[in-house]
From Swiss-Prot:
This is Red chlorophyll catabolite reductase, chloroplastic. Homodimer. Interacts with HCAR. Interacts with SGR1, NYC1, NOL, PPH, PAO and the LHCII complex. Part of a SGR1-CCE-LHCII complex, which acts in chlorophyll breakdown. It comes from Arabidopsis thaliana (Mouse-ear cress). Residues 255-286 form a coiled coil. Catalyzes the key reaction of chlorophyll catabolism, porphyrin macrocycle cleavage of pheophorbide a (pheide a) to a primary fluorescent catabolite (pFCC). Works in a two-step reaction with pheophorbide a oxygenase (PaO) by reducing the C20/C1 double bond of the intermediate, RCC. Belongs to the chlorophyll catabolic enzymes (CCEs). Red chlorophyll catabolite binds at E154, Y207, V208, S209, D291. Keywords: Chlorophyll catabolism, Chloroplast, Coiled coil, Membrane, NADP, Oxidoreductase, Plastid, Thylakoid, Transit peptide. It is an enzyme of class 1 (oxidoreductase). Residues 1-39 form a transit peptide. GO terms for molecular function: red chlorophyll catabolite reductase activity. The absence of light completely suppresses cell death in acd2 mutants.
Length: 319
């Protein structure tokens, strides 16, 4: 794409009838070529980001929620995030028969930032039973310079009238051994109020993951909920009036109380830093093994799955 752009630029700016100009190299050529290549790369990157932000297989209400959350993360943390550098065939990919498609957007944090990386994704897969599985998720992972929790929101849907919601600030310290951590991030922020409010709706019930690992990884205040509505419009109403405000408030807590570097959150001791790194990598590695390593080959085939999972492992620092 860059070469086509450059060739077009030079052919249109050098008329053939001006022989002195065509026989003499332009003094701007060395500058124009990298600029053209850079512009082309920027255009391609923008196209792939727009593709991710389409969230094309979900309802307008759900799409708006995901766009709002991702835009808030990128706008508020813009100075701390590096551009997404995933290969194009990892940022958007599908399986050979076209029954599954996914988009991936990962931005690493700057070296001076407490952010390790932010990841957003959507997955669409037609299941042999005739239904479609649609998963949309956004997560923020912090590095070992801070002990503050991470952020996750995920919506899993295989029916137009029901879905599973996971919304949490997953803890990175043992809550029994560190009661001050529990108080600071979960009690003082009233994080459990969102789960309690959602559970007051007759359509909402607790969701119990079949994975013991998943259940152990989330905080006691996690909103792990199953929403069953009689009508599609009712599900949209719950998403718009209840889930969306809760997700935005939890994200705000993460941005204000976890990402901002304050003295009490900075990890000082080398032993504590190493322990956080071990825990973070163990969590990421186990998540990939139990989820992507098992499910992606079924959805996308071995070749595509291998390429994408390798890129994710590299971004997660667990290669």
């Amino acid at each position: 794409m860059a070469m086509i752009f450059c060739n077009t630029l030079y052919s249109s700016s050098s008329p053939s009838y001006l022989s002195p100009l065509t026989s003499k190299p332009s003094r701007f050529s060395k500058n124009l070529r990298p600029r053209a290549q850079f512009q082309s790369m920027e255009d391609h990157d923008d196209h792939l980001r727009r593709k991710f932000m389409e969230f094309p297989y979900v309802s307008p209400t759900r799409k708006q929620l995901m766009v709002d959350l991702m835009s808030t993360v990128e706008n508020r943390l813009q100075s701390q995030l590096l551009p997404c550098n995933l290969p194009p065939d990892v940022r958007n990919f599908n399986n050979p028969n076209g029954s599954a498609e996914a988009s991936l957007h990962i931005r690493s944090g700057d070296k001076s930032s407490p952010i390790d990386f932010v990841i957003g994704s959507w997955i669409h897969c037609k299941i042999p039973t005739g239904v479609s599985l649609n998963i949309t998720s956004i997560s923020g992972f912090l590095n070992s310079s801070t002990k503050a929790p991470n952020f996750v929101v995920e919506l899993i849907q295989s029916s137009s009238k029901s879905l599973v919601l996971i919304l949490d600030l997953p803890h990175r310290k043992d809550l029994v051994l560190n009661p001050d951590y529990l108080k600071e991030y979960y009690q003082d922020t009233a994080l459990d109020s969102h789960r309690q409010s959602l559970l007051k709706l007759p359509e909402v019930n607790p969701y119990v993951s079949p994975s013991l690992f998943v259940r152990s990884a989330f905080s006691p205040t996690a909103s792990m909920l199953k929403i069953d509505a009689e009508e599609e419009d009712k599900l949209e109403e719950i998403l718009r009036d209840h889930v969306s405000p809760a997700a935005k408030e939890v994200l705000e807590v993460w941005l204000e109380r976890c990402v901002k570097e304050e003295e009490e959150k900075i990890v000082v001791g080398e032993e504590e830093r190493m322990e956080l790194e071990r825990r973070d990598k163990s969590f990421r590695r186990k998540s990939i093994e139990d989820d992507l390593d098992l499910q992606f080959p079924r959805m996308f085939g071995e070749e595509v799955s291998s390429r994408v999972v390798h890129a994710i492992k590299e971004a997660f620092g667990v290669l």
